[in-house]
Amino acid sequence: MAEKIMVGMSGGVDSSVAAFLLKKQGYEVTGVTFKLWDDPQADSGCCSADDVRDAAYVCQQLGIPHYVLNYKELFRQEVVAPFVAEYLRGRTPNPCINCNRAIKFGAFAHKLRELGFDRMATGHYARCGYNAATGRWELLRAVHPAKDQSYVLYNLTQPQLELLRLPLGDYSKEEIRAIAEKNGLVVARKPDSQDICFIPDGDYGAFLRRYTGSEPPPGNFIAEDGTVLGRHKGIARYTVGQRKGLGISLGCHAYVKRIDPRCNTVELTTEESHLFCRSLTAEQVNWIAVDELTGPLTVEAKIRYAHPLSPAVISPGKTPGSVRVEFETAQRAPAPGQAVVFYRGETVVGGGTITNTEDSLC
């Protein structure tokens, strides 16, 4: 009897081809689209009517069932509210990681068991499998690095990985579009989404105003020596390393070096080299390749989604669930709130949320 697999389908080409490939492999496939967010000011973006229709139409083309699961309240609680809270604290969150943890692989895994399915799948570009030598399920980078999405999947647990299938991990984006074209899928030429799904216009400031009903309080721009340079329009508008759109002119390039929510200040530097640091601390760490970190481990680390891998040594932090990261070469502007993810070769060791950076080169 064929295994029953539930595929998360966003209405895009990746998840559509994932469903196609799994059906071709002999699975009994059902497509599921998550209803996560409604924005009356947006005609497109996360969970738009067009996306739901596209997913349903692809399922019709493939001859498989399609259902919509309403997770709007859970999404608001677990993704949107923490996103807003982090920005108001002057941090730079990655909501996709929270969404994967709480919904795409959290609530989704619970629902498929409830409905009697054997497996779950998504259209992420990554690979997973069982390592008999370690007795653990592993997460691996996609074969084609340009599209690899393992960074946003570091929070996966062993039970989730056991259930998961990632059929796109061996393919390039061009190959996926070619498969969609060849098989007449209606979404074959649909553009990729580029922004945070619930902020399709990319205007974070406007979203925060709508969500909170108020403007973030203004405060001071300060120099590295504490001198007041001018006024900012709220720390939620800035991120570490930012140069453009600061709203202040110093007669030369200036960069956000540090954001202090306690004092409501944004520290600027005119020296880009002062953004670099060699070490950081991360918390809320999730381990995949190991059960726990018991001592120093040499890895390659990535401090943001599009950042290159950098050699580092990780060691247990001072508090439970934390890790200290020492880079071989200084990294530009690691931002508190972002994820740092650790790799050994193709394998994801684990990752966590950056809380602070140390050893600035200034």
Task: Please give the residue ranges for each predicted region.
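ATP-dependent adenylation/nucleotidyltransferase module used to activate substrates
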Residues: 1-154, 165, 174-175
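AMP-forming adenylation/ATP pyrophosphatase catalytic core
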Residues: 38-39, 121-128, 132-362
